[in-house]
Design a protein with these regions (language model features):
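Signature of alpha-helical transmembrane segments in polytopic membrane proteins
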Residues: 1-140, 172
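A solvent-exposed beta-alpha-beta segment
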Residues: 26, 133-194
Length: 194
C-alpha cells in the first residue's frame, strides 16, 4: 500500500513538471513570436504561430518524457537537475529545430531560435530548481516522510544515522536501532529499541 502511494506521488510530480515545462516552452515562443512581429526577425517565421508553438510543445513533451524528471528523488542535487534540463533542451533543439527546418515552419539556424532556446534553458532551469526547493521545504516540514529503523549499531550504521538525520529535506526520520545490547557510542537522540 505504501509503495503505491509513493509511486503515485512520483508520477504526479513527473506529470506536473513535464506539463509545466511544456507550457513554459509554448508561452516563451508565443512571447518571441510577438516580439518578432514587424522586425527583421519576422522573415525567419514562415508558418503560423499556432503551427510553430504546437510543434515545439509536442517536441518538448517527447524530449521531456524521454529524459525524465528526477525532482521526486530523496537525494538529488542542483547540478543533477541542471544536467537533466540541459540534456533535455539539447535533445529538444535537435528534434524541434530539425522538424521546424524540414517542415519549412521557420529558420532554425536563426539567432531568434538560438535566443529562444537559451531562454527555454534558463526558464525551465529556474522553474525546476524552484520546485525542488519547494519539495525540500515540504519534506522538512514533515510531508512525504520515510521512517527508518536501523538494525545493528556498527560504525556503518552510525554513519548512516548521521547521513539520514543531517539533511532533514531528504525526508527520512530515524525511529531507533535494534542490536544485541545498547551501544554507548550511538547518539542519544536515536533510541535503543531492543
Amino acid at each position: 500500500m505504501k509503495r503505491g502511494i509513493a509511486e503515485s506521488y512520483n508520477r504526479l510530480v513527473n506529470v506536473f513538471v513535464i506539463a509545466c515545462d511544456t507550457c513554459i516552452v509554448g508561452g516563451l515562443f508565443h512571447r518571441f513570436y510577438y516580439w518578432a512581429q514587424d522586425t527583421a526577425w519576422e522573415k525567419t517565421l514562415q508558418a503560423s504561430e499556432f503551427q510553430i508553438v504546437a510543434t515545439l510543445m509536442l517536441c518538448y513533451l517527447l524530449c521531456a518524457m524521454h529524459t525524465g524528471v528526477i525532482l521526486y528523488r530523496r537525494k538529488v542535487f542542483a547540478y543533477e537537475v541542471l544536467t537533466r534540463v540541459t540534456k533535455n533542451v539539447v535533445f529538444f533543439a535537435i528534434l524541434g529545430g530539425g522538424i521546424l527546418q524540414l517542415g519549412g515552419y521557420m529558420d532554425a539556424w536563426s539567432k531568434l531560435f538560438l535566443a529562444y532556446l537559451l531562454a527555454v534553458l534558463v526558464c525551465v532551469s529556474v522553474f525546476r530548481l524552484g520546485l525542488r526547493m519547494l519539495i525540500k521545504v515540504y519534506r522538512t516540514k514533515g510531508g512525504n516522510l520515510r521512517y527508518v529503523v536501523l538494525v545493528g549499531s556498527t560504525d556503518n550504521n552510525r554513519e548512516l544515522y548521521q547521513e539520514l538525520t543531517s539533511q532533514s529535506w531528504a525526508g527520512y526520520r530515524v525511529l531507533g536501532y535494534f542490536d544485541f545490547e545498547p551501544n554507548g557510542h550511538f547518539p542519544q537522540e536515536c533510541p535503543y529499541l531492543g
